[in-house]
Design a protein with these regions (language model features):
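Conserved protein kinase catalytic/activation segment
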Residues: 1-3
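Activation loop
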Residues: 17-27
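Conserved catalytic-core motifs of eukaryotic protein kinase domains, centered on the activation segment
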Residues: 12-16
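Regulatory extensions appended to serine/threonine kinase catalytic cores
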Residues: 122-141
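C-terminal lobe helix-coil module of Hanks-type protein kinase domains
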Residues: 27-122
């Protein structure tokens, strides 16, 4: 996947224009971008980072946050990809995609710490090829 939607990042606040027009991409925009714009902060970007990570694994974006507020149909990363990726990564994605901004990491530093933390649950699961190789080695030798 390639990140291409930086149009919103180019928009700046000038003295002549004191109000920013809402700009967001459904699926990647945090709930506060739809409604409570006074609550924007680092946690808003963290939601978008979580959505981007989710989209990398899923091949498409998660459901739009405004739809999730009405009827949350998001299948958590932990449920969807357990055994395929580290629990640490999946938990971090789910943490970033919390609808309540107070439940998300509150800074990029805290998100970085979560991503760099040692995985205490053990090693990452084997890939399909690694599992097949181990199984064949056990059976053949």
């Amino acid at each position: 996947p390639v990140l291409i939607d930086f149009g919103a990042a180019r928009q700046t606040l000038t003295q002549e224009e004191m109000r920013l027009q809402p700009m967001y991409t459904p699926g990647f925009a945090a709930p506060e971008q739809y409604h409570n714009r006074e609550r924007l902060g680092p946690w808003t970007d963290i939601y978008s980072i979580g959505a981007t990570l989710y989209a990398c694994l899923a091949g498409g974006p998660p459901p739009a946050a405004d739809a999730r507020l009405e009827n949350d149909k998001l299948v958590s990363a932990r449920v969807r990809w357990t055994g395929d990726y580290s629990e640490q990564l999946l938990e971090t994605i789910d943490h970033c995609l919390k609808l309540n901004y107070l439940e998300r990491p509150q800074s990029l530093f805290s998100l970085q710490k979560a991503l760099l933390a040692k995985n205490v649950s053990g090693p990452a699961p084997l890939s399909v090829l690694q599992s097949l190789k181990q199984k064949l080695n056990r059976e053949l030798f």
